[in-house]
Curated annotation (Swiss-Prot):
Gene Ontology CC: cytoplasm
Example of a GO MF term: zinc ion binding
Task performed by this protein: Catalyzes the dehydration of methylthioribulose-1-phosphate (MTRu-1-P) into 2,3-diketo-5-methylthiopentyl-1-phosphate (DK-MTP-1-P).
Organism phylogeny: Eukaryota, Fungi, Dikarya, Ascomycota, Saccharomycotina
Record organism: Clavispora lusitaniae (strain ATCC 42720) (Yeast)
Annotated protein name in UniProt: Methylthioribulose-1-phosphate dehydratase
Encoding gene, per UniProt annotation: MDE1
Length: 250
């Protein structure tokens, strides 16, 4: 097996496959949409990032189908390198060639700008609907909901200029997520995503209008928790809006 892979269930390539199956069952990465990447924070080189490829059924993904990059953005390994000219999955046509996820530059932005340990991109219907209900807004806000406490309280360190977690958000806090407009090609979202990350240091996610959401965290498990918590809050927000209940309590 390549030095980039391991049989350990906690290895990033194996975790991506596990999470893709889970997210598929949640309806977040259907039809080959969405993507996951994990930085090998506990490995010998914490700058190594594993990224799920483009155009693959996420629930059928295999570890060796991952692309491997090194921050700030060099591709070290392609699944085409080990395929002998044929795909690694019997699901794919023999002429299939693996392509890096179109999310790759956006994932790398989260790692380079926020020192993230994992970045998740889903096509959650709750995320899409929330951006449609508030189509005239450039940010999504919500307060006084218990689930907000699952999200990190982030601040800019005055000495380093880096965004750091200083605790967890509290019940009375207001969650604010930036909303950026979608583009015809995923990679064209990169500049808007980077601007949102810069302008919203307290956010751990960016909504993409009529598209989905990008969520990151300091570890893969934190990113998973943040993604689940935000999706819960977005689903609740849709119901509150339909019932005429303000999302931010005065």
């Amino acid at each position: 097996m390549s030095s980039f892979f391991s049989d350990s269930p906690t290895h990033p390539a194996n975790l991506i496959c596990e999470l893709c199956r889970l997210f598929y069952n949640n309806g977040w990465v259907t039809g080959t949409g969405g993507g996951i990447s994990i930085r090998d924070v506990d490995g010998p080189n914490p700058n190594i990032v594993y990224i799920a490829p483009s155009g693959i059924q996420k629930e059928r993904l295999q570890p060796r189908e991952m692309f491997v990059a090194e921050l700030p953005g060099k591709i070290l390994r392609s699944p085409n390198d080990d395929s002998d000219g044929q795909p690694l999955s019997p699901d794919l046509a023999k002429s299939f060639r693996y392509k890096p996820s179109a999310c790759t530059p956006l994932f790398l932005s989260c790692y380079n700008m926020r020192d993230a340990g994992a970045c998740i991109h889903t096509h959650s219907q709750n995320a899409v609907m929330a951006t449609l209900l508030f189509e005239d807004k450039v940010e999504f806000s919500m307060s006084h909901i218990e689930q907000i406490k699952a999200l990190p309280h982030l601040q800019v360190d005055s000495d380093t200029g880096k965004v750091q977690k200083v605790g967890s958000m509290q019940f009375y806090d207001t969650m604010v997520l930036p909303i950026i407009d979608n583009t015809p090609h995923e990679e064209d979202l990169t500049d808007s995503l980077q601007e949102a990350i810069k302008n919203y240091p307290g956010a751990t996610a960016v909504l993409v209008r009529r598209h989905g959401i990008y969520v990151w965290g300091e570890t893969v498990w934190k990113a998973k928790v943040y993604n689940e918590a935000i999706d819960y809050l977005l689903e609740l927000a849709i119901k509150m809006h339909q019932a005429g209940i303000p999302l931010v309590k005065k």
